[in-house]
Design a protein with these regions (language model features):
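A sequence-level detector of short linear motifs
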Residues: 21-22, 31, 104, 153
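Compact structured core domains
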Residues: 24-76
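Nucleic acid-binding interface residues in structured DNA/RNA-binding domains
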Residues: 3-16, 62, 69-171
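A generic structural signal for ordered secondary structure
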Residues: 19, 24, 54, 126-127
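DNA-contacting interfaces and partner/effector-binding or oligomerization modules
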Residues: 1-24, 28-30, 38
Length: 171
């Protein structure tokens, strides 16, 4: 069955962090987030997602099952990153952070500055892009930390960031 560009599908996953909502456009994962009292559906910008079993959700469940067993998954589900070019680039860089490792906002900023051939990039700008990540856990924004190893904010809450880093034995 072909899906239109506006189709949005959702499926839920019970994780050690709480219930997660997986969102897809029918072929790629477009969102993964914790279901909150505000409801994950509110994050889908006014669309009415259909709950449906899709291959991308099956792949994502396999990835999450492996991850929550404390193993680095051997594959990444097909992702469709959203946001500005800068936000997408930050997400691409986060995808290269190995399981069990962390990097700082400043390290990502320095990498982007080198790529752009500019002297510096703001770590705060990187922080804004990290905070806009729509695909938690798989795009591992929890692996990005502050200068000096300081743990800083996480959209799903600091206690969950700590839980994920402990699972990966990063702290």
């Amino acid at each position: 069955m072909r899906h239109t560009a506006t189709d949005t599908f959702i499926q839920f996953y019970d994780s050690p962090l709480g219930k997660l909502a997986m969102r897809s456009d029918g072929s790629a994962l477009i969102g993964l987030g914790l279901v909150s009292k505000q409801a994950a559906v509110a994050a889908i910008a006014g669309s009415r997602p259909q709950e449906k079993s899709l291959l991308i959700f099956q792949e994502t469940v396999r990835w999450l099952d492996s991850y929550f067993r404390g193993r680095a998954p051997s594959f990444t589900p097909k992702l469709k990153l959203s946001g500005s070019d800068f936000q997408k680039r930050v997400c691409e860089i986060m995808l290269t952070i190995p399981f069990g490792k962390t990097v700082t906002y400043g390290e990502i900023a320095a990498r982007i500055a080198r790529e752009r051939g500019i002297p510096r990039m703001s770590a705060q700008a990187v922080g804004g892009a990290v905070g806009a990540n729509p695909i938690l856990i798989i795009v591992p924004c929890h692996r990005v930390i502050g200068a000096g190893g300081n743990l800083t904010g996480y959209g799903a809450g600091m206690e969950r960031k700590i839980q994920l880093l402990k699972l990966e034995k990063s702290i």
